[in-house]
């Protein structure tokens, strides 16, 4: 009865790290179960000390000692939900993920910055590979390795680029990384989804006319100073391939993880003849747009 009856009193999560000694695993299980002695006997019989698997487990209310020992021996993990959004660099993404899966931020960051991985997936650099990470909530096993994490995200990226999206992309004349890069600038310029296609249209006009994009968020990224409140004249002189005041065209890679809405706004950019925009004086998050410098200065 003690082996088959319910021993788990309340549902709870159990995280077993790869480097945990067995005593620590056993203690974490024993904390909240009845029939502790039955757990010890059955665990010994199944040699759990030598065979337990790392993972995220859910101890369900009413589980028996046999259920719990088998779960740990066979590694019957429950996936965790992993949310990715609002990050600007691979290092920031690594930090955010390390709070949601077992891998630490250092091993994640080094995988994200691995040149061989980028090359294998067909990217020119780890910073352009950053465009495979699309904001969403995904299910992963908590023990997923950084390498398997990247491979899974690459699959999601390939699914995202449907035939329809690729057709629109071809019409824009941009490649996928360039779409993500422009979307990252649009996303940093506005969080207003309904305004994104118009801002994307302004930048498309500038790209086509060979006018520097002059996008302030690229300065913050170039300086890696994301708290910068005001962009001053001296900041515009900061030498970096990401400085779109000094260099024409798009920066070398995305300056953040853009929202899906921002990517779609670039693919469905508004056909307009605006060249300038600035924040509205009401500071409601929207912008005034202008065709000429005179109009722009009047805004």
Regions found by a protein language model. Name each.
Residues 2-161:
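Signal peptide-directed extracytoplasmic domains
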Residues 95, 101-103, 117-299:
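Bacterial extracytoplasmic/cell-wall-associated proteins, especially those involved in peptidoglycan
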């Amino acid at each position: 009865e003690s082996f088959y009856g319910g021993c788990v009193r309340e549902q709870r999560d159990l995280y077993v790290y790869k480097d945990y000694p067995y005593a620590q695993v056993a203690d974490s299980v024993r904390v909240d179960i009845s029939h502790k002695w039955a757990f010890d006997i059955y665990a010994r019989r199944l040699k759990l000390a030598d065979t337990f698997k790392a993972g995220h487990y859910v101890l369900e209310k009413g589980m028996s000692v046999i259920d719990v020992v088998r779960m740990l021996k066979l590694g019957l993990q429950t996936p965790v939900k992993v949310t990715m959004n609002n990050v600007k660099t691979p290092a920031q993404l690594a930090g955010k993920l390390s709070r949601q899966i077992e891998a630490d931020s250092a091993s994640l960051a080094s995988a994200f910055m691995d040149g061989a991985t980028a090359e294998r997936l067909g990217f020119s650099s780890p910073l352009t590979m950053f465009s495979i990470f699309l904001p969403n909530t995904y299910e992963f096993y908590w023990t997923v390795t950084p390498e398997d994490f990247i491979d899974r995200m690459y699959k999601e990226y390939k699914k995202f680029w449907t035939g329809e999206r690729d057709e629109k992309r071809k019409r824009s004349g941009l490649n996928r990384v360039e779409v993500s890069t422009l979307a990252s600038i649009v996303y940093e310029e506005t969080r207003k989804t309904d305004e994104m296609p118009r801002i994307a249209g302004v930048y498309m006009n500038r790209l086509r006319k060979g006018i520097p994009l002059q996008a302030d968020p690229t300065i913050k990224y170039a300086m890696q100073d994301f708290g910068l409140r005001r962009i001053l004249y001296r900041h515009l002189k900061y030498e970096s391939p990401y400085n779109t005041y000094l260099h024409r065209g798009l920066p070398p890679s995305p300056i953040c993880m853009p929202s899906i809405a921002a990517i779609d706004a670039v693919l469905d950019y508004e056909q307009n003849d605006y060249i300038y925009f600035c924040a509205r004086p009401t500071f409601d998050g929207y912008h005034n747009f202008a065709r000429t410098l005179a109009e722009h200065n009047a805004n």
